Amino acid sequence: EFESTILGPSVPDLVALTNEALSISITQKKSIIDTTTIRYALHRKTWDLEADRNLSPAKEHGTLFYQVGRAFAHTVLLRNCSIDPISIYIKKNLCEAGDSSLYKWYFELGTSMKKLTILLYLLTCSAGSIAQDLLSPPGPDEQNLITSYGLVENDSDLVHGLSDIVHGLLELEGALVGSSPTEEEVEGTEEEVEGTEEEVEGTEEEVEGTEDEEVEGTEEEVEGTEEEVEGTEEEVEGTEEEVEGTEDEEVEGTEDEEVEGTEEEVEGTEEEVEGTEEEVEGTEEEVEGTEDEEVEGTEEEVEGTEEEVEGTEDEEVEGTEEEVEGTEEEVEGTEDEEVEGTEEEVEGTEEEVEGTEEEVEGTEEEVEGTEEEVEGTEEEVEGTEEEVEGTEEEVEGTEDEEVEGTEKDSSQFDNDRVTLLLRPKPRNPLDIQRLIYQHQKYESELEEDDDDDEDVFAPQKMLEDLFSELVWSPRIWHPWDFLLDCEAEIPAEEIPEEEDELPEDALETEVAVWGVEEEGEADDEEDVLLEAQQEDELLEEEDEELDEEEDELDEEEEEPKEEEDELHEEEEEEEEEEEEEEEDELQENDSEFFRVKPIIPRHRWIFRKKKDVFEVLSYPEEATEISKELLRLLNPKTKRDAPKRPRQRWWTKKKQDKHYELLLDRQRWLITKRSLSKSNGFFRSNTPSESYQYLSNLFLSNRRLLDQMTKTFFRKMAFPG
């Protein structure tokens, strides 16, 4: 069928055919291109090309299957490339002179390490036989670099391999629809899969080798940086040692210079003393030398004179005797004078020696003074060191105190130590009703004594006190009460004695006040429903009696309609003001605490059961209804609501029954709502603030999950493997 086509093996025709097949598959929303799509694309392109030119038919129809698979791989894996690298290895005619550079570029792309894994994946997915031929070892007779990698020379082998893969994909599509492939096809696909796995293992080994080399290079760089860091640390230590050395040298230099200066002064004074001693010794030696020389000279002169005297004795005995006597006197005079002069000189030198000794003693005293000064400087240095140690101790002490202070200051932020800020405990509406009942009873007893006084009850004052102090009491902060229900056992001792004074209907209907609900077994719920039905029947009978009495009263009444309209308008205005105040208080409380749940605490004498599981809720709608009823009772607008006589009690049994009817309706609504929520089996929030908190937590958790997914995705993209 495919041999009758007129498409040639040129690249433009094949690209046009593949694009046509892809466009058809996209318009038909097909994930796999089958043979019918290829036939339809071939038919359309044939009639488009027949008008332009006539080409020879294709020899191998399997090439079309390969081209379709190549186009699919190109659009999925290589969207940024202009031409698929596999098309380079299809035909020999692509390796022409005009396309040699492009062919070489794609050849380098296929044989490079960077794109090798992508190319192998593409080849193993779309054409396993091409990968086997491309990676085959080169033959001995091949000389060209391009053919040394075992490029495909025969088109038939290529086409058969590609057609097998395309047929395998088509059979896989049929298997997904319902048909199963044959055993031979399964064996062929298994062999191809084994070949591709071996190729993938080879590529993984190459990739591991490159990764090991890169890791080793990075480790060497890290070691080099660590050595540089160590070198810088050694330089820092050297600079610190130099700084310490300079500080020590400065301190020691100042001390040594002062001590050495004083020692040099002492040595100089000692040298001066030694010089003076040497001078004294020299003067003594001179004195001794002069004495010896003079004595010897005088002796020689005496001897010469004696010889002369002896020589002349004979000749001039008489004349010489006189001369000798004269000379002897002269000699004695000269000797005495010289001896006295030398003695005076010796005494002068001795005085000089004594002066030098005194100077030496003065210098020694100066040396001792300098030594004392040195000791004083040393003591000052020790004192400065002690001061430095003291300052260091003070700094350490201040740091410890600051650390302790910060620890103490930070203790207030500890969650375990933060006390709960509990607001005042609110009052129970049942207590309010009980107080009103007692007050009315007391007032009725007072009215018996004073029949003329009609203003004893003071309903306006009671109304103000009721709504200012009791009804709108502040709500308590309990953030986790909506998760768990309370269980409590009430002993009989705690039940007040005034219980018998209340009406029987009040005790029976207090079960339904303010959303009180018993979450026990199914039998308890049925009992509550039966009691509610019985009470409904009693209330219907009483309502009929009330209607009859009201009809009688209406006949007697003849009041103008204007007064009723004015009273009605005033009542509506009061109700609107009360509702606005109530909404403002609720908004303020909800804005102050994000998860506030208004809770009215349970009264002690509501139930006496051992297992009393309940949950108390407050709803503004029911509160407004009760307030309206109380307003109507305390401030009547018609005579039928007011007492007929001063002694008549305002809080009658029928009015109580009318009031409790609203509470019974609320109890029925709560029971049905709770049963529905239990049947659904999931927690449902009871206040808008809780539902807002639940939704905010849900969106925050989803946002965190999305952030984690994006972080992991970018981490995988930045650091693959």
Curated annotation (Swiss-Prot):
Residues 182-404, 492-508, 516-591 have a biased composition (Acidic residues). Gene3D superfamilies: Serralysin-like metalloprotease, C-terminal. GO terms for cellular component: chloroplast stroma. Keywords: ATP-binding, Chloroplast, Nucleotide-binding, Plastid. GO terms for molecular function: ATP binding. InterPro entries: IBP_b_roll, Serralysin-like_metalloprot_C. Residues 176-424, 492-592 are annotated as: Disordered. Its main location: plastid. Residues 405-417 have a biased composition (Basic and acidic residues). ATP binds at G174, A175, L176, V177, G178, S179, S180, P181. Belongs to the Ycf2 family. This is Protein Ycf2. It comes from Oenothera picensis.
